Regions:
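Short, mixed-charge low-complexity intrinsically disordered segments
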Residues: 36-64
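Short linear sequence elements within intrinsically disordered, low-complexity coil regions
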Residues: 8, 15, 22, 37-40
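A short, exposed loop/beta-hairpin motif centered on an aromatic-Gly-Thr core
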Residues: 13-27, 50
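Short aromatic-glycine-(Arg/Gly/Cys) micro-motifs in beta-strand/loop hairpins
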Residues: 1-17, 47
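Acidic, low-complexity, intrinsically disordered interaction modules
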Residues: 26-27, 34-36
Length: 64
């Protein structure tokens, strides 16, 4: 199991796996902090159990 980053785009209701799997929690947190956001996008960092550890949101567009 690995730490993963998930994305939900503006006006979407579906979370999409971003293709990044990291075994180290520290490396996952550092990568997540630097991951670029698209306008209106929401990103989640999830632990190996699928629990959301952190969430970032671009607020340049309203969210639904």
């Amino acid at each position: 199991m690995a730490y993963t980053i998930w994305s939900k785009l503006y006006h979407s209701t579906t979370w999409v796996f971003c293709g990044l799997q990291l075994d180290s929690e520290k490396l996952a947190e550092q990568t997540f902090a630097m991951y670029p956001l698209a306008p209106g996008e929401t990103l989640q960092l999830r632990d190996p159990d699928g629990t959301v550890m952190d969430e970032r949101r671009d607020n340049s567009r309203p969210h639904s």
